């Protein structure tokens, strides 16, 4: 299952979460996102990591393109985002 893994700095986590992520300007469900996870650094609560899970690689690639276009907008107000498509090879609960 392909996952789009994103990392970036935000000015303020709570504001970013409410006004950017929760507002969902990219239409996650319509774009094929099946699940998301948000994490942040314990040392820097404004450094976020997001994982968007898809059924297919083409869906993940299309979302990657949408996000690159969104990040070009100065209103995005996020610092140097990085994103890559990964695949989960193993997960086990203990």
State what each model feature region is.
Residues 6, 21-23, 50-52, 58, ...:
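Intrinsic disorder/low-complexity signal
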Residues 16-18, 60-62, 93:
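Short acidic, gly/pro-rich beta-turn/loop elements at beta-sheet edges
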């Amino acid at each position: 299952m392909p996952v789009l893994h994103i990392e970036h700095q935000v000015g303020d986590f709570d504001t970013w979460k409410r006004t950017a992520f929760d507002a969902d300007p990219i239409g996650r469900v319509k774009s094929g996102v099946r699940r998301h996870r948000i994490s942040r650094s314990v040392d820097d609560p404004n450094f976020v990591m997001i994982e968007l899970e898809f059924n297919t690689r083409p869906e993940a690639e299309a979302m990657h393109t949408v996000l690159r276009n969104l990040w070009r907008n100065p209103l995005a107000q996020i610092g140097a985002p990085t994103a890559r498509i990964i695949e989960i090879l193993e997960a086990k609960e203990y």
